[in-house]
C-alpha cells in the first residue's frame, strides 16, 4: 500500500479540511486502520434505507436519522460553509465528513454502525464547534452537546410504559463549604407518600456531565419505574447532584480534588436529604454509585467514610480489592461493571477476588458496549436488585 504526498500539510488535512490517514505528527489516524484492514466483501454490504428520525430530535425535526443497522445520517443547512464535520462521542472523537448537495445542504452518513444507545455529538463548521439544531441538547464534555439515540435490541427496560411512575424533583441545598447553593435531582419512587421511609442511592454522573445526566441520558427514573412495577427491585430514592466541585476544564481530571466533593456530599447533601425527605437514615440503607469519574468519587468517598454508605457501585469507574476494605462486614454489597469494549477481564477478576474473600460482590459486563450510557443503563438495571436486601 502506498500513500503519496504525505509530507505536506494538505496531505494531513486535505485541501478541503477532509481528514486523511495521518496527523501532523505522522501518527496513523483511525481512517488509516480502516484502509489497512479494508475488506471488499464488507464494503459491498448495503446500507438499509429504513432511516427514521432519532427519538432525541427536536419536535418536528427529521434529522438526524438512524436506521435498523445502527447507521446515523445527518443533514445541516449551511450553504455558505466550506466544511461540515460531525464529531461523535464524549469530547467529540473522529469525524463524519458531510458533503454539500446542489441545494447547498450538507448531508452524510456514518462510515459504519454505531454502538446501540445514547451518543453525544457536535458539528464543526469551518473550524467552529456548534450543536445540531435538529437534536436536543445534553450536558457532556463540559458543555451542552447534541444527542442521538441508536435503538438497542434490549431497550424495553428503559422505555416509558403504562406503569406507576415516580417523580424527579429538583432541590436546592446550602453548601457552606463552597459558599454557594447547590442543586440536586431526587427520584421518588411511585410508593413515596411522605409517610413511609425509604433507603437512598446517591448516584453520580461522569466527567464533564452534571446532575441532569442520570435522568436525561441515563433514564434512571424510567428504569426504576419499570423494575419496581415488575417486582425486580425494592423501591428506593435516588439522589443525583453535581460532582465537579472544582471548576476544571475538559481534560483536567488528574488535578481534580475529590475531598471537596466528599464534604459537599457527606456533610451537606446527605443531612439535607435526611432532613427533608422520608429516608431511612442509616448506613445500611444508603448506597453510593457512579459512572466513570462518579465511580472514582464513589471509590474514594466510600473508603474514606465507611460509616456513611453500606452499598458501593463502580460503573466503568475502577474496582475494589479485599485489601482496600479488609473487613467484609463493613459493606453490605459491592457492584462493579463496565462495557465489553473496556477491558472487562479486570472487572470480573476483581469481583471474583472480592467474593473469595467473603464479600457480597457482583461483577457485570455490558455486551457490545464501551464507555457509554447503554453500559451504565444496563449496569443500573443489574445493580438495583442487590441494593438494600436484608
Q: PLM features: residue spans?
A:
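Short, well-ordered coil↔helix boundary/capping segments
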Residues: 1, 29, 341-345
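Short glycine/proline-rich, acidic loop/turn segments that cap or connect secondary-structure elements
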Residues: 2-14, 350-360
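Aromatic-rich peripheral "rim/lid" segments of glycoside hydrolase catalytic domains that contact
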Residues: 4-42, 387-390
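Non-catalytic cap/lid and distal C-terminal segments of serine-dependent acyl enzymes
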Residues: 60, 67-95, 100-390
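N-terminal edge beta-strand
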Residues: 47-70
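Low-complexity, Pro/Thr/Ser/Gly/Ala-rich linker/spacer regions in secreted
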Residues: 37-49, 326
Amino acid at each position: 500500500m502506498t500513500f503519496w504526498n504525505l509530507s505536506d500539510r494538505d496531505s494531513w488535512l486535505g485541501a478541503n479540511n477532509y481528514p486523511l490517514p495521518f496527523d501532523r505528527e505522522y501518527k496513523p489516524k483511525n481512517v488509516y486502520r480502516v484502509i489497512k484492514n479494508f475488506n471488499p466483501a464488507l464494503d459491498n454490504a448495503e446500507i438499509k434505507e429504513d432511516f427514521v428520525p432519532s427519538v432525541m430530535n427536536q419536535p418536528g425535526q427529521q434529522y438526524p436519522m438512524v436506521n435498523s443497522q445502527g447507521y446515523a445520517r445527518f443533514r445541516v443547512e449551511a450553504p455558505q460553509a466550506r466544511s461540515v464535520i460531525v464529531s461523535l462521542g464524549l469530547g467529540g472523537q473522529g469525524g463524519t465528513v458531510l458533503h454539500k448537495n446542489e441545494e447547498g445542504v450538507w448531508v452524510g452518513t456514518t462510515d459504519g454502525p454505531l454502538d446501540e444507545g445514547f451518543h453525544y455529538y457536535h458539528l464543526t463548521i469551518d473550524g467552529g464547534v456548534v450543536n445540531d439544531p435538529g437534536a436536543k441538547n445534553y450536558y457532556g464534555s463540559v458543555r451542552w452537546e447534541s444527542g442521538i439515540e441508536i435503538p438497542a435490541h434490549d431497550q424495553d427496560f428503559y422505555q416509558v410504559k403504562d406503569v406507576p411512575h415516580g417523580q424527579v424533583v429538583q432541590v436546592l441545598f446550602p453548601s457552606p463549604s463552597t459558599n454557594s447553593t447547590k442543586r440536586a435531582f431526587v427520584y421518588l419512587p411511585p410508593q413515596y407518600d411522605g409517610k413511609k421511609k425509604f433507603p437512598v442511592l446517591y448516584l453520580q454522573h461522569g466527567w464533564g456531565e452534571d446532575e441532569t445526566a442520570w435522568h436525561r441520558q441515563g433514564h434512571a427514573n424510567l428504569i426504576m419505574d419499570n423494575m419496581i412495577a415488575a417486582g425486580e427491585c425494592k423501591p428506593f430514592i435516588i439522589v443525583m447532584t453535581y460532582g465537579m466541585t472544582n471548576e476544571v476544564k475538559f481534560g483536567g481530571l488528574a488535578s481534580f480534588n475529590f475531598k471537596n466533593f466528599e464534604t459537599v456530599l457527606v456533610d451537606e447533601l446527605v443531612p439535607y436529604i435526611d432532613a427533608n425527605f422520608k429516608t431511612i437514615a442509616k448506613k445500611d440503607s444508603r448506597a453510593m454509585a457512579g459512572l466513570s469519574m462518579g465511580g472514582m468519587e464513589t471509590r474514594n468517598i466510600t473508603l474514606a467514610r465507611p460509616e456513611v454508605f453500606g452499598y458501593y457501585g463502580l460503573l466503568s469507574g475502577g474496582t475494589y480489592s479485599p485489601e482496600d476494605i479488609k473487613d467484609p462486614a463493613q459493606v453490605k454489597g459491592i457492584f462493579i461493571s463496565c462495557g465489553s469494549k473496556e477491558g472487562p477481564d479486570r472487572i470480573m477478576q476483581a469481583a471474583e477476588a472480592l467474593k473469595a474473600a467473603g464479600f457480597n460482590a457482583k461483577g457485570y459486563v455490558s455486551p457490545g458496549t464501551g464507555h457509554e450510557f447503554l453500559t451504565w443503563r444496563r449496569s443500573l438495571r443489574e445493580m438495583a436488585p442487590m441494593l438494600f436486601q436484608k
